[in-house]
Amino acid sequence: MSATQTPTKKLYIKTHGCQMNEYDSNRMRDLLGESHNMVATENPEEADVILINTCSIREKAQEKLFHELGRWKNLKKQNPELIIGVGGCVASQEGAAIAERAPYVDLIFGPQTLHRLPEMMETKKSNGVVVVDISFPEIEKFDKLPQPDADGVSAFVSIMEGCSKYCTFCVVPYTRGEEVSRPVADVMAEVIHLAKQGVREVNLLGQNVNAYRGAAADGTIVDLAELITYIAAVDGIDRIRFTTSHPVEFTDALIEVYNQVPELVSHLHLPVQSGSDRILMAMKRGHTVLEYKSKLRRIKKNRPNISFSSDFIIGFPGETDADFEATMKLIHDMEFDTSFSFIYSPRPGTPAADLPDDTPEEVKKQRLAILQDRITQQAMAISRRMVGNTERILVSGYSKKDPGQLSGRTENNRVVNFRCDNPALIGKFADVLIEEALPNSLRGSLIASELDQDWH
């Protein structure tokens, strides 16, 4: 290394929470790689900068954060030059408390200010005091971030930030702000950039992604349905997913896209939270169970082979046995494939936190176990029905458990492993005969692939 070269610094990022946080962490990595020539490491003990990207959805998020920070405090003692930063939704909500309880933390930043990390690091180096920036500067961060580097055949693309629904249980509007959509040209530029790097599948992200209303160059407003048609026309992009959606924003135009755009996958994650109208009203969800079911049935009419997944909150204040049974009926009726389900925990500052909650914890745990068992049974039934089918999968790499097998995903998000020793198939589509259904994956045999001359 010459005397003029700057030594490479190492960056460790710990990510909690949703896919938006995963996306943000990847962008931090790109950003600091460009601004400070940093490279990622999986070992915090060798890092020059440690960042934790936090999530405040679940209870005890704060305590988990301080537990993690406590482990890194010793690293700071060993290396006073180490920079420790806290980002994400807990930082946005609890910035002052973090600075007070963990004075060894150098940077505190929210989801909307991560693009200012390089400047924050320089400020810290120059004046030595903790730098806190948890403001909500609209959509500015996307203007300041470098184009992303692809990591594999699939990529997340954030198309909007925040949520304006203010469900009574949810902290997101307070930590990520109101809904703000990226301009269409910005989204398209990122998708095209990823496609040129070999990305075949994009997953469009937003806390309430189907509320997307992006400005086009001519001043018109483009919704998610129209944006999907634009992205489907990008050369190289063959699969499109989006998450997370809100039932109220699931428009007729978006339902119709399932009939028009084959690149849109046959899998939809649409959180409902409860199958009880009474609980939905208390949650301020803005729709009934019947309205929710009607939308799913219309989507299934356009795409008969589609699979559905959802979110469920068990033990919301006032939930009765009848409310829970209504949720179980909805799960049966809609044949949900997978779910994110958990016991309600009050989030500070939300309206539901003030509601009386007299349901015993043991009852909540029993209900959650029953719900998760039902979903697992339904998922296995769907997997077994796929045995004997030839499924088109996007090959993403080698199987984690068996390097002699390649692995990929079906349209309905099933992991498929199959025996193949040709690494050229990674990043390509393949047709695989499904031969066995396992609890968390499928196993099959390669029938054909894009590498074949007669592929179609």
Curated annotation (Swiss-Prot):
SUPFAM superfamilies per UniProt: Radical SAM enzymes
Cofactor(s) annotated in UniProt: [4Fe-4S] cluster
GO cellular component, one term: cytosol
Free-text cofactor note: Binds 2 [4Fe-4S] clusters. One cluster is coordinated with 3 cysteines and an exchangeable S-adenosyl-L-methionine.
Residue numbers binding [4Fe-4S] cluster 1: 18, 55, 89
Gene Ontology terms, MF aspect: 4 iron, 4 sulfur cluster binding; metal ion binding; N6-isopentenyladenosine methylthiotransferase activity
Residues bound to [4Fe-4S] cluster 2: 163, 167, 170
Subunit structure, as described in the record: Monomer.
Record protein name field: tRNA-2-methylthio-N(6)-dimethylallyladenosine synthase
Name of the coding gene: miaB
